[in-house]
Amino acid sequence: MALHIHEACILLLVIPGLVTSAAISHEDYPADEGDQASSNDNLIFDDYRGKGCVDDSGFVYKLGERFFPGHSNCPCVCALDGPVCDQPECPKIHPKCTKVEHNGCCPECKEVKNFCEYHGKNYKILEEFKPSPCEWCRCEPSNEVHCVVADCAVPECVNPIYEPEQCCPVCKNGPNCFAGTTIIPAGIEVKVDDCNICHCHNGDWWKPAQCSKRECQGKQTV
């Protein structure tokens, strides 16, 4: 009976050793994700501190070597403490620039606005246009629109009218003035009633007509 127990103990001692050496694998007991990532990083990205510099694509540069870290970066020099990059004073971008590229150390304007925008419409440089009958405008090289409003002369009548597509009022019936509530033409004497003859002041249409009484020609009553 004692012999059987001893043999059993020997089997128990041997079996764990066999399992450890033959059956255990990394697939059965995977390592922690953090340990795997750290291990992979060490394999892919070597530590070049104090030895060189690495750009965005993983290319290694020696100490003292000049390189561009990325397609839109300023040039750098690989130093002991890491890249030392230029910081130039870039030219200002034109305020009318419509397309800016960042493919170098400084941004570059590739397309400048070459038109003017006015009330939702675009006009070429130096193009003249009339947004209304009374306005004359031009697209300046500065991409700004300058407009001038028509300076209309004072009409020589008391009843001017506005024609379509014309800015300034016109006197369809020529110069005139008021004689009381009656409009009379300028340049002649006009009998406005049985007793009064009136005429407009020369050039002063806004003044009331000058009138004089004559012998009344109305019917006399007894």
UniProtKB/Swiss-Prot annotation:
Which BP terms from GO are recorded?
A: negative regulation of BMP signaling pathway; positive regulation of neuron differentiation
First and last residue of the signal peptide: 1-21
The record's Gene Ontology cellular component field reads: AMPA glutamate receptor complex; extracellular space; synapse
Q: What is this protein called?
A: von Willebrand factor C domain-containing protein 2-like
What is the species of this protein? Mus musculus (Mouse)
Specify where it is mainly localized: secreted
Q: Which UniProt keywords apply?
A: Developmental protein, Repeat, Secreted, Signal, Synapse
Q: Where can this protein be found? A: Secreted; Synapse
**InterPro entries reported for this sequence:** VWC2/VWC2L, VWF_dom
